[in-house]
Amino acid sequence: MHASVRVPRHVGIIMDGNGRWAKGRNRPHSFGHRAGVRAIKRVMYGCEDLGIEVLSVYAFSTENWTRPRTEVRALMRLFHETLEREFDEIHSRGIRIVVSGRRGELSPRMRERIDDAERKTAQNPNGTLNVCLNYGGRAELVDAVRSLIESGVSAAEIDEKALAARLYQPQLPDVDLIIRTAGESRMSNFMLWRATYAEIFITDTLWPDFDVPDLERAISDYQGRVRRFGGRPEPAEPLELSS
């Protein structure tokens, strides 16, 4: 990776492969999810060291409720335990915690823990961990539109800026780089608004095995791309040959 070249401000990760990782070791899915939490911690601190401002991790989607009830319960318990266990260290390193998603379907205990973590870390200056929990890109847009309607905004006043201001975490910048693990090549309803012009990096590495060197490879690939944002770079001026 070229340290002197730009790094993305906002990296989003679709963490895939926990179940396959556990199955390959003849262990239950919960074993893979716990290993996946350790990977989040490694990558979060790697982003901090590299100067990446925001890391968004796709922890639980609005569609994940259709998984077996025992797995959903185990995941929710793991989220709460992880926030309890890791909070002090994350806070001491100056990392801000925010959560994107529909909170109404989470337990009161979980909502209280999230609110507490967001409040206590709100002024932390060393980057942001955005946990996408009960999150869906379509749900985020639906909720943003509902918020606009409820606020009494007229149709003539609705534009991209107005809609963006109603997203779950409107202060966050657009996603520059999306990393998807386990070789899958779908967006899976992740960050549909913010990732409009994100670069995408796909790796066969299963999420529990993903580490800082994998992150650095993804960023190195990102650094080699030309980001056009729908436009086209100006052609180089023709050389004037002396007669």
List where the protein language model places each region.
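Flexible, compositionally biased loop and terminal segments
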Residues: 1-243
